């Protein structure tokens, strides 16, 4: 039963995020907000809502290990599995903006997270630093997008009442789904004798990263594999700056020695994909398989440690 509740929680998270994005994007279009800005803000933040709900809920419930390990695990999964799988399906050329900007920012925020948790706590001040970084990151994206701006296409929008219904139901599903996911994950951890860190790094982080994986696989099958790298790295940056920033600002998050070690692994993975990206212009199938194998090895390690 508890496993079904975990699945239910994750389904609610994904559907809630989907409804919230659709409703919010329609409101933004009615207000004549350019689609490029909608994509860089509402949609980008919307794809991180499952992780946000789980981490914020876990922090408020005192499940600090899940709050941090969920984000670290999601970022490692995004980097190695989401990008790796896309490369295996369809090799793709590297985007210069991602290589020269996003991958470097990804490394920087990963290092910053590791430094912040070294004292065993991610406090409110450090959370606010992340949130300031988030604002700067989004402003930089918007400025960059405006340089390459294209004409907005006519897109059908929802009615005012539908927008409100979508947003309200979406938020309700996200909150309820986050609560169910954290509660059931803790019960599963207790039943199987697993730590909160292990359940956060595996089941919860993979579950909340499924939207990114599904989106990237669909993009790869349509010959748009290059989008997966931007989506994965952008999601990683949002996860740290937005989710851990908001979570620790609301309620300081304690970090265990395992959490601290896993942030070092995240730095290593961030450097790995940067090195792979720098070495040649194409993300080949061999590189994709290598990245997936690295993730499998990491999974084996955290289960037996």
Which residue stretches match the model-derived regions?
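Hydrophobic alpha-helical segments, chiefly the membrane-spanning helices
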Residues: 1-305
């Amino acid at each position: 039963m508890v496993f079904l509740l975990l699945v239910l929680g994750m389904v609610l998270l994904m559907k809630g995020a989907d409804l919230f994005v659709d409703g919010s994007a329609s409101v933004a279009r009615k207000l004549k907000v350019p689609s490029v800005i909608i994509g860089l803000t509402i949609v980008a933040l919307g794809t991180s809502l499952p992780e946000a709900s789980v981490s914020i809920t876990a922090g408020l419930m005192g499940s600090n290990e899940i709050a941090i390990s969920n984000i670290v695990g999601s970022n490692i999964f995004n980097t190695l599995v989401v990008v790796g799988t896309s490369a295996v399906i369809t090799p793709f050329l590297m985007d210069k903006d991602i290589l020269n900007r996003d991958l470097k920012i990804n490394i920087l925020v990963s290092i910053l997270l590791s430094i912040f948790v070294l004292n065993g706590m991610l406090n409110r001040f450090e959370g606010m630093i992340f949130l300031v970084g988030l604002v700067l990151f989004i402003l930089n994206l918007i400025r960059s997008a405006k340089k390459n701006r294209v004409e907005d296409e006519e897109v059908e929008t929802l009615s005012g009442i539908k927008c409100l219904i979508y947003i309200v139901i979406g938020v309700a599903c996200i909150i309820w789904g986050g609560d169910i996911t954290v509660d059931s994950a803790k019960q599963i951890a207790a039943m199987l004798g697993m730590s909160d860190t292990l359940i956060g790094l595996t089941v919860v982080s993979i579950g909340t990263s499924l939207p990114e994986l599904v989106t990237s696989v669909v993009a790869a099958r349509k010959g748009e594999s290059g989008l997966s790298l931007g989506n994965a790295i952008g999601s990683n940056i949002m996860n740290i700056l937005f989710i851990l920033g908001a979570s620790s600002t609301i309620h300081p998050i304690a970090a265990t020695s395992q959490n601290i070690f896993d942030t070092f692994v995240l730095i290593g993975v961030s450097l790995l994909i940067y090195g792979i990206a720098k070495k040649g212009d194409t993300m080949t199938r061999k590189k994709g398989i290598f990245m997936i194998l690295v993730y499998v090895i990491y999974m084996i390690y955290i289960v037996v440690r």
